[in-house]
Regions:
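Terminal disorder- and signal-encoded targeting elements
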Residues: 1-33, 42, 219-220, 234-235, ...
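Non-heme iron-sulfur electron-transfer modules
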Residues: 2-29, 52-82, 100-130, 420-431
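Iron-sulfur-cluster electron-transfer modules
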Residues: 30-38, 68-235, 243-284, 288-292
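Short cysteine clusters
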Residues: 40-46, 50, 87-93, 97, ...
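Short functional micro-motifs and their immediate structural scaffolds
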Residues: 48-51, 55, 98-102, 342, ...
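A conserved helix-loop-strand patch within extracytoplasmic ligand-binding domains
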Residues: 136-140, 301-327
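Cofactor-cradling patches in redox/metallo enzymes
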Residues: 200, 206-300, 306, 330, ...
Length: 434
């Protein structure tokens, strides 16, 4: 019988009859990511994209810390490697992976396990990381007497002691507290000047726009009101981003529970959630549903937007910008890694190139290096600056001598490496439209 002939008794079978789908990510709080590791076929795209691996030859990279470690844990009880603490949580590996392996989810879970099981809770490193992770708590105290806090934190001796005692690099300038927090301003203002039940947004301002860069929060409110939106400012906690990066998952869950509940009420009443910080929007959209099983968490993820993104989707921003004009100014724009992960990396450049009076240049796709609290650790400072070197160079060769970014810690790094003033896109949008 030739190869082309078929046996008369042959009966094809349906794959669907025998196939049973495997739920690799069961919906449980105790998530086992080991099956998901099998989607990795070791192409090393994640390692190539990793900014830490590029400058630190001792760092094994995201492939090892993610799928390879989970594969090992499938076969034997092995400890999480301590190199997980060198991951900056930039999440660029998520975007790089062609197989959609949940790398950052694996890293966050592994880091949480390492901190919980292996880190000495009385060590200076743990206490320092806990303090950095809970910036909102520290800022709540410092902002009660902002002028005194700024004076004390600006003293040279404070920087020296901070490095020697807590491991916070003395090279860094501690950001100043605003003399009035955003929420204090909001209360004094009497809330939104627009009443429109059909166009409501709930503003998730995050920690930094509340305590430090209050003008960003004010700009967000004024711009959205200009488009007829009623702005709500619900009760809220930290997004949890610095807690994820430091393995403080219990702290992050505590904050997430409040945010899901409070923002969920606004969503139930028809509002969309708006964040002015791309790391905050990333946390609410991606990290919350990946790491926690909280009622309403998926709804929050689905209804969260970055501010500029929301306006570009729901309003005719192109026409509004083309009809506006500002004084001549040139910007060097850096897209935060967490903006890239959400597909938002060029939106500010595309928008403001249409604004009369503005020259804006994208300074490339490199990481700033600071990665939230990462660059605020003495042992990571040099690595942070090596990662940021490419961005600094591109900024200095750009036409503009004012930087622009959506991320507050990227703004710190940009200013630290170049001395440039750094602005948020919402501030320029307010200048153009309000």
């Amino acid at each position: 019988m030739s190869d082309a002939q078929q046996p008369s008794e042959f009966e094809p079978t349906s794959v669907a009859d025998d196939f049973e789908a495997v739920d690799v990510f069961p919906s449980t709080e105790d998530m086992d990511l080991r099956p998901g590791a099998d989607n990795c076929y070791k192409c090393t795209s994640c390692d190539t994209s990793c900014p830490v691996a590029e400058v630190d030859e001792d760092f094994p990279g995201p492939k090892f810390q993610g799928p390879e470690q989970w594969r090992l844990k499938r076969h034997e009880d092995v400890d999480i490697d301590d190199s997980i603490l060198s991951c900056s949580n930039c999440m660029r590996c998520d975007d790089a992976c062609p197989s959609s392996v949940p790398l950052s989810q694996m890293h966050n879970t592994a880091r949480g396990e390492y901190v919980e099981e292996h880190m000495d809770k009385l060590s200076i490193e743990y206490l320092r990381n806990r303090m950095l992770s809970n910036y909102r708590t520290m800022a709540s105290i410092g902002s009660k007497v902002p002028r005194l806090s700024n004076f004390v934190m600006g003293l040279g001796i404070t920087s020296v002691l901070g490095e020697k005692i807590m491991g916070i690099p003395s090279e860094r300038d501690v950001p100043e507290f605003a003399t009035e927090t955003f929420r204090q301003w909001w209360k004094k203002r009497g809330g939104s000047t627009v009443s429109n039940p059909d166009k409501q947004v709930a503003y998730f301002h995050g920690c930094y726009s509340n305590f430090n860069t209050v003008e960003v929060g004010k700009a967000m409110v004024r711009v959205f009101e200009e488009f007829g939106y009623e702005v709500l400012v619900p009760k809220q906690q930290c997004s949890g981003t610095p807690m994820f990066a430091n393995g403080m998952l219990k702290d992050a869950r505590r904050e997430a529970e409040v945010n899901v509940r409070e923002l969920g009420e606004a969503i139930d009443n028809g509002a969309e959630v708006i964040a002015s910080c791309t790391s905050c929007s990333m946390a609410l959209r991606q990290e919350y549903p990946e790491l926690f099983d909280i009622e309403g968490i998926e709804e929050l993820s689905e209804h969260t937007w970055e501010a500029l993104e929301f306006l570009r989707v729901h309003e005719d921003m192109g026409q509004a910008i083309r009809e506006s004009e500002v004084d001549p100014q040139a910007f060097a724009y850096h897209a935060p890694c967490h903006a890239r992960n959400q597909g938002l990396d060029r939106q500010a450049v595309e928008l403001f190139r249409e604004l009369d009076g503005v020259t804006i240049e994208d300074v490339g796709d490199s990481c700033s290096g600071i990665s939230g609290t990462y660059g605020w650790k003495s042992e990571k400072y040099e690595t942070s600056m090596k990662i940021g070197a490419e961005m600094f160079e591109h900024m200095e060769h750009a036409e503009g001598d004012v930087g622009m970014t959506e991320c507050p810690t990227c703004a710190m790094q940009m200013n630290h490496g170049t001395g440039y003033e750094i602005r948020h896109p919402l501030e320029l949008l307010e200048e153009a439209l309000v």
